[in-house]
């Protein structure tokens, strides 16, 4: 995100007329601020409160409709409550939607049958949910997640890998640190570099350091390249079932996703082409007794465990590539 964009949005808010606030929400506002450690200047407090109230009322309306069966998922107030949707998209979503296919191609014809449900968390392939903070580094978290899974598949050891290593060091491959990147570029960096450090040795800072401090002796992963999956959900399903967790990009720019809490996420406005957020598919499944209905992808996000379904989201599966989940899927080869 460019700081000037944030400042512009902020200044526009401050310059507007003083908003009329709902005093009935005072206690909720003070509790939310305390929970998330928010401190504002005198001029900013009213504007942020107004944004928060607008988001709160939108969430309440959605959940009323959810209780009436009009939606398949619920929403909840969270750490993004004082952000406009425009700010949210600028700060949190850092996938660069300009994929240049350079990897091998996944051959789905070699896979005949797959299970009706898969969850690689149950097999030890997936680390705990992480938090990218206010840095557009989603691509790095998606990439480490896929590489962590493949290294576990190869070695039987699950080691948390360093997103900061990717943020600091993969600019020559085309990534832009906190201003966005591509998972395939990250996989290419690991191959070119000959390794990727552990999270423990190269901890995440949530900002750019303008200095690459990779230490070969602390490397815990390597790859030989990457595989791009054909842009079909059936191909993605076969890859998830047979390979492990898969890096994908989605359209995550909607308020409904910003405040997602539980259930199967489906928003008719979600695009299959305008992708802005890198995440990790760790499995798939279905709700109820009919495996042909209420199907979902199990998606690991990088906004902390308090967001959504303990840091995850169930995304509608086999609904015309909803939110573009199969548009830019890939995984590293190790």
Curated annotation (Swiss-Prot):
It is found in: Lysosome; Apical cell membrane; Cytoplasmic vesicle, Secretory vesicle, Chromaffin granule; Secreted, Extracellular space. Coiled coil: none annotated. InterPro entries: Papain-like_cys_pep_sf, Pept_asp_AS, Pept_cys_AS, Pept_his_AS, Peptidase_C1A, Peptidase_C1A_C, Peptidase_C1A_papain-like, Prot_inhib_I29. Pfam families: Inhibitor_I29, Peptidase_C1. Zn(2+) 3 binds at residues 184, 228. It is a peripheral membrane protein. Inhibited by the propeptide produced by autocleavage. Long isoform of CD74/Ii chain stabilizes the conformation of mature CTSL by binding to its active site and serving as a chaperone to help maintain a pool of mature enzyme in endocytic compartments and extracellular space of APCs. IFNG enhances the conversion into the CTSL mature and active form. Inhibited by CST6. Inhibited by the glycopeptide antibiotic teicoplanin. Inhibited by amantadine. Its EC number is 3.4.22.15. Residues 1-17 form the signal peptide. Residues 18-117, 290-291 form a propeptide. The active site is at residues 138, 277, 301. Zn(2+) 6 binds at residue 274. It comes from the Eukaryota. The keyword Metal-binding applies. CDD domains: Peptidase_C1A. Disulfide bonds join 135-178, 169-212, 270-323. It catalyses: Specificity close to that of papain. As compared to cathepsin B, cathepsin L exhibits higher activity toward protein substrates, but has little activity on Z-Arg-Arg-NHMec, and no peptidyl-dipeptidase activity. Zn(2+) 5 binds at residues 251, 254. GO terms for biological process: antigen processing and presentation of peptide antigen; CD4-positive, alpha-beta T cell lineage commitment; collagen catabolic process; elastin catabolic process; enkephalin processing; protein autoprocessing; proteolysis involved in protein catabolic process; zymogen activation. Thiol protease important for the overall degradation of proteins in lysosomes. Plays a critical for normal cellular functions such as general protein turnover, antigen processing and bone remodeling. Involved in the solubilization of cross-linked TG/thyroglobulin and in the subsequent release of thyroid hormone thyroxine (T4) by limited proteolysis of TG/thyroglobulin in the thyroid follicle lumen. In neuroendocrine chromaffin cells secretory vesicles, catalyzes the prohormone proenkephalin processing to the active enkephalin peptide neurotransmitter. This is Procathepsin L. The gene is CTSL.
